[in-house]
Each structure stands twice: as C-alpha cells, then as structure tokens.
Amino acid sequence: MLESLIAMIVLAIGLGGLSSLLMASLYTNHRSSQDTSSTMVAEHVLEQISALPANSATALTVTDCAGTAWNISTQGHAQAAGSGGSYGGDGATLTSGGVIDWTQAYGAVPAGYAMQYVDCGNGGRQTVYDVRWDLITMSSYARMAIISARPTGATVNGGLRFVMPANLRTIGGM
C-alpha cells in the first residue's frame, strides 16, 4: 500500500512538470509561427522595393487583407543625410548595428516608411504586423534597403511570447 502511495506521488509530480512543459511548448509554437509570418511580410516589402530601379522615387501601394492600402516610399538618401538617423538614409531610424531601431515609436517613423500590415488567417483570425524600413542611397545607381517586421503585440524584450524582429537587408542597383 505504501509503495502505491509513493508511486502515485511521483507520478503526480512528473505529470505536473509535463504540463508546464506542454504550456511552454504551446507558447513557443505560436511565437514561431508569428516569427515566420513577420519574415514573410518583410520579404514582401523587400521584393516590392527591389522591383524598382535604385534611382526611382516612385511610391508603391500594398493592400493588406483588411483592405487597407499602404504607401511604400522608395526614396532614399545618403547615410546620415535623411530621416533615418546617423546610421540610416530615409525611413525608420537604424541602430549602430545597421538594423531597425524598435525603440522608436511607430508614430515617429516618417509616413511611407512604416505600416501596420494586417494578415488574415483561418477562422477570421487577424494578426497585425508592424513593418518598418529604411533606404540608403549608395550612389545614383545603387540603394540599400533594410526592412524589419514583428507582431504589434511583441513590445517587450524577452519571455516566452517575445518574437525577435526579422531584419532583412539587400542592395539593389540598375
């Protein structure tokens, strides 16, 4: 009888530990799916900008699944000569590491260089992604684009639900 009681206690402790592991895996699985989707949204913006010649200043329009038409500005400036801070050209501020500075408020990013893109999923679920970019004119024939995206709810660094922002960079020319 005593052995059965001890076995049941050990089993209960083991199942309790397994339930916490299960919850952590559910959180990280959802986080991974949002991380993949934010990379795809950033890639979409990158492809749209890269499709134009480097010296083009033509604005593009992208429509999300909520029907919002977002303007994508393709005008860049030389490094430290535009709105992107000391390390960027035009657009969202860049850090010294050359990535989008997520400490900058969304409203502080110049119009045409940020959007809150809505992605629709199964069952009417929607996820909003904060997408920002910076364009650095390297010469009259070359431009560097840095695009970053993350879910809007990922405002805190660390934790199980934190999604590392995707940062994509390319150099396009004529």
Segments the model singles out, each with a brief description of its role:
Residues 40-174:
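Low-complexity, Gly/Pro-rich coil/beta segments used as flexible assembly/activation regions
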Residues 2-43:
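Aliphatic-rich helix starts adjacent to a transmembrane/signal segment
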